[in-house]
Amino acid sequence: GETYLTDDLAMRLNDAVTKHLDFMALHQRNGAWSAPAYSWPAMIPCETSYRPFAHAGRWVNFVHGANGTPGLGQLYLLAYKVLGDQRYLDIAEQAGDWVVAAQDPEGYWFFRYDRHTASRPTVKGDSTETAFHDGLQHMPAMLLATLYEATGEEKWLQAFVRSSEFLVGAQNPNGSWSHNYDVAEKTSVNRFGERQSGDFSNGIMHSQMTVMLVAYGITGEKRYAESLVRAADWIASAQLGPPTYGWAAHYNEDNKPSWGRVFEPPSMSQVGAQDLLMSMYDMTGDAR
């Protein structure tokens, strides 16, 4: 396509990108990558980019999904769209197949899975609680949505709808989503087990609202749009008073600012809420 790059620079960039893509493809196993980060130069799988302890590829990590299998699947799908190389679509679909295989029948994903060698991946560690932070539900859902957009295959749509339906059901009555989800109780909770506790940290509201918006765009089902409006209503209700009129990162079951982790005391900022409300205004024209 048209570009403002010189021919030489375009060729060099293409060469650099394809080298990286081909290199990372070598580390895909049965559709998945072992980690969201690898220790250079030995390429030993590590937990995250800021907790680089090695785990020797014993599991597949879904939290911090932008850097793991769901995010890499989207990267290869983008590479296919830009470069037109069928290999990259194949790699993205293999990642998608792994994501679908790991999905719980109720539509959610857990933090980690044992290496997938055959049949369904098995959950590693706690299988009584999952979460909404750091793209744990959002990134695999968006991979499925973009694969459906690119291929039109129903299997991607079906898995994406399962995820979307889970998020609608897991939304708190007040419109928020919490940090965690109790699988046994089928309810959202914060770090301390309190229900109906909204949370902006680590992209929780942004991520789930994005999935709802995409689900509405793909299916046209009103319940996804209604979920978005409920989320915006909660954001407006959670706004704190003068003089700053900001928002906390974490809320308790009474919709009051609360602690998160030990270094996350009750506090206030504009980050994480204001842009969501402006986006909802752009979409709805509702000035409230």
Model-derived features: where do they sit?
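Glycan-recognition and catalytic cores of secretory/periplasmic carbohydrate-active enzymes
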Residues: 1-288
